[in-house]
Amino acid sequence: MNIVALASAYGVGSISIVRLSGDGAYDLAINLCKKPLTPRYAHLRKLYCENMVFLDEAIVIYYKAPFSFTGEDVVEFQTHGGVVVANLIIDELLRLGARVANPGEFSKRAFLNGKMDLVKAESIQSLINARSEGAAKILARTMNGELSVFVNSLRDELIKILAYTETCIDYADDDLPSDILHSSKDLLLNSYKKLEHIINISNSKKGLIDGYKVAIIGRPNVGKSSILNSLLHYERAITSETAGTTRDTIEEQIKFGSHLVRIIDTAGIRDEFDSSIEAAGIEYSKRAAREADIIFCVFDSSQKASLEDRQILEFISNLNKKTIYVLNKSDLEFKFDISLNAVLVSAKLDSTPLSKELESYLNSQDTNDIMLSSNRQIEASRLASEAIKNALELLNESELELFAYELNIALKHIGSITKPMENSELLDKMFSSFCLGK
């Protein structure tokens, strides 16, 4: 079946790109441009619909299978910008027998036709949604095959160890090198360490890929909303001397250097509250803190620390999150009496010190390490690591049959990172999150 979709962003622009893929893509394209197309050449062609009604003049490029993104015949029409002309071309191709592509269907066909593995497919989608320059660089390396090389190398090591083990099982009564199991253990331990390293790096720096989430936490009236407004450089949140003004979370995106960050202003946390609505807001605040990558823990520097301040400090410390302590209202007389390594700011005057502190931390998280770029990859790696750990314990007990069983489990999960077992439901779910023209 031939599929078609808009491959460029929806809306007004200088050009729109319509992508067509399938065994009959070339014939459908000829119906529109009325002249033959040479593969991999950019042709300027007039496009016509039924009854020779002129549609547009476009650049048409034909990619003959298998030398295309999907591995099938692909034709791309670069039309004048705007959605109307592109939709007219799509409508004509639908009339001729194509159908609208499902989200991610072009990439799914590329995967099924061996043009890319799942790691590359996922990295392309993640690169489109990259939240920072650091993330874009990591994902470009992943898309270029560095993660796939790592995974395949790890898989080869496990296969080698499994081959050693099965030799020991099959020829248990024969004279075999005395160090064969010792060598297997050393190889497996090395594989385990490499896998654990990439899992830990990927978990600790996940915000690089997904975008960091920062929660502003504190008791009422310490200036949390004022800090949000100051960072945004406009009045987004209502501020008031009345405690409990913020009842719900407010989320905005702000760019710090090369990083796009989600900042969440939250309701003030206190034990006594005026209504069930405020109580719900406080629970939302605590949940935002638990889900955040970074916490701005805000205090009023012009007042002595209250019991609520101390309780919030204890709550935050138990979360084991990156926390930037903020002493607000630095333009007033300093009275805060807890010793903290904190950033002094006056949200009313200038929040630049806080911006610089956050940007410095974000820059420190940039890495040259290979990273797993999706939750699916992290979970598969975790399961593989768990199986390898079990295998090492069994090897110490000389339980070779069970050791081989755990190795096979590890191999299955490692292999699933680049190419899972045939599971159409899994593939449909994964590719459905892609853009329509991808």
Curated annotation (Swiss-Prot):
Transmembrane segments: none annotated. One of its GO terms (biological process) is tRNA methylation. The keyword Nucleotidyltransferase does not apply. PROSITE patterns: G_TRME. Coiled coil: none annotated. Residues 211-363 form the TrmE-type G domain. GO terms for molecular function: GTP binding; GTPase activity; metal ion binding. Mg(2+) binds at S225, T246. (6S)-5-formyl-5,6,7,8-tetrahydrofolate binds at R19, E76, K115, K438. Its cofactor is K(+). One of its GO terms (cellular component) is cytosol. Keywords: Cytoplasm, GTP-binding, Hydrolase, Magnesium, Metal-binding, Nucleotide-binding, Potassium, tRNA processing. Its EC number is 3.6.-.-. It is found in: Cytoplasm. Gene3D superfamilies: P-loop containing nucleotide triphosphate hydrolases (3.40.50.300), Probable tRNA modification gtpase trme, domain 1 (3.30.1360.120), tRNA modification GTPase MnmE domain 2 (1.20.120.430). Binds 1 potassium ion per subunit. GTP binds at residues 221-226, 240-246, 265-268. Its main location: cytoplasm. It holds the Pfam family TrmE_N. HAMAP family: GTPase_MnmE. Exhibits a very high intrinsic GTPase hydrolysis rate. Involved in the addition of a carboxymethylaminomethyl (cmnm) group at the wobble position (U34) of certain tRNAs, forming tRNA-cmnm(5)s(2)U34. Homodimer. Heterotetramer of two MnmE and two MnmG subunits. Belongs to the TRAFAC class TrmE-Era-EngA-EngB-Septin-like GTPase superfamily. TrmE GTPase family. This is tRNA modification GTPase MnmE. It comes from Campylobacter fetus subsp. fetus (strain 82-40). The lineage of its organism: Bacteria, Pseudomonadati, Campylobacterota, Epsilonproteobacteria, Campylobacterales.
